[in-house]
């Protein structure tokens, strides 16, 4: 056609036709590039989805390990309190090997990092929908993980120092080691009457219970939050997410907050801390005002569209005791109280 137009001296039409061909070629190239870019993006999205599935798998595995870790140390804490408060008798030590070994054994908490390391390698390809999840994930694998590793090391070193001190100074310890820790009178007398033993037990409580156990609980709360946020980014509802992980995180009761008529703070007598997820669907930051177990006033911020507080520590309420929800101007939106062991609250 172009040749025919040139032969007939129709130069204007020739150039129009040529330009049209060029435009069509350019459009074709752009379409091809768009399709190629789309295909590449699909590949990246699939890869990122796989990476987050690995992160979720790691988190679930670590939550299960944290559950065992928490159970172990909560039982140990009850034994330590008996020892510190002088509630243990000779007979108790004779019959209960766990009482005799509150200082001698410990557990470490290990966190899987494979998924997180892979995520860091592909961080530039992560879609913005995962922004909320990344906040928790980065906190877990930097700040919290560092605390866990420090606690693991401190606990291990304390045990080594304490057992070496006992081996150097007490014949009963060397004898008990040779007889598979069979209790003897000197051992039990040391546990009952030596003030240095109480010091050893208190140090164990500080490192293993106050530090290690507390950090494990923070890890669990943040890990659950990260799981939920990954699911929310993929259009999985909060209800579906919590149900899917029920075996690992326990059951949650779904209720709406209902104001109570009176609001009178009373010091709880039977403390029962309640881990709480609060879903703030208001279009502004909200604040939860309440008293903790020690009667201290606390104000916890909840960003809009958040499902847990923007604080490092976990959020715990006392069962059947009230708290206030305030807006960003300090106006009270209502007074509420918990009614179940586990609660999921809608703020709306």
Predicted regions and their residues:
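Intrinsically disordered, low-complexity Pro/Gly/Ser/Thr-rich segments with frequent PxxP/GP/PP motifs
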Residues: 296-320
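Short, surface-exposed ligand- or partner-binding patches at beta-edge/loop junctions that are enriched
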Residues: 319-331
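Hydrophobic membrane-insertion alpha-helices, especially the h-region
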Residues: 19-34
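Long, hydrophobic alpha-helical segments that serve as membrane-spanning/inserting helices
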Residues: 1-12, 16, 37-255
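N-terminal low-complexity, Pro/Thr/Ser-rich intrinsically disordered segments
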Residues: 248-268
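Short, surface-exposed beta-strand/strand-loop-strand elements in extracellular ectodomains
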Residues: 284-295
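Asparagine-centered strand-capping/turn motif at beta-strand->loop junctions
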Residues: 267, 275-282
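Structured interaction patches on ligand/partner-binding surfaces of diverse proteins
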Residues: 304-305, 328-348
């Amino acid at each position: 056609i172009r040749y025919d137009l040139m032969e007939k001296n129709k130069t204007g039409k020739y150039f129009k036709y040529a330009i049209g061909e060029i435009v069509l070629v350019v459009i074709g190239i752009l379409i091809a590039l768009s399709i190629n870019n789309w295909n590449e993006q699909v590949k990246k999205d699939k890869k990122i989805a796989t990476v987050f599935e690995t992160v979720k798998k790691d988190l679930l595995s670590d939550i299960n390990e944290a559950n065992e870790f928490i159970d172990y140390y909560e039982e140990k804490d009850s034994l330590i309190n008996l020892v510190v408060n002088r509630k243990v008798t000779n007979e108790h030590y004779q019959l209960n090997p766990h009482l005799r070994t509150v200082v001698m054994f410990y557990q470490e908490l290990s966190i899987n990092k494979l998924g997180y390391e892979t995520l860091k390698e592909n961080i530039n390809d992560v879609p913005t929908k995962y922004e909320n999840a990344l906040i928790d994930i980065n906190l877990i694998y930097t700040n919290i993980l560092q605390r866990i590793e420090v606690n693991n090391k401190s606990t291990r070193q304390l045990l080594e120092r304490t057992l070496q001190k006992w081996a150097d100074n007490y014949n009963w310890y060397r004898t008990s080691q040779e007889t598979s820790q069979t209790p003897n009178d000197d051992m039990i007398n040391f546990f009952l009457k030596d003030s240095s033993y109480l010091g050893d037990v208190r140090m164990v409580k500080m490192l293993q219970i106050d530090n290690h156990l507390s950090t494990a609980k923070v890890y669990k709360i943040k890990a659950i939050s990260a799981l939920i946020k990954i699911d929310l980014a993929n259009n999985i509802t909060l209800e579906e997410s919590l149900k899917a992980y029920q075996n690992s995180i326990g059951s949650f009761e779904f209720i709406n907050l209902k104001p109570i008529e009176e609001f009178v703070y009373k010091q709880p007598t039977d403390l029962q801390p309640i881990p709480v997820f609060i879903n703030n669907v208001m279009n502004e930051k909200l604040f939860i005002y309440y008293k903790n177990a020690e009667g201290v006033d606390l104000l916890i911020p909840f960003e809009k569209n958040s499902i847990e507080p923007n604080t490092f520590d976990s959020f715990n309420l006392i069962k059947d005791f009230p708290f206030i929800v305030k807006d960003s101007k300090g106006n009270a939106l209502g007074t509420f109280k918990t009614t179940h062991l586990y609660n999921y609250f809608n703020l709306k």
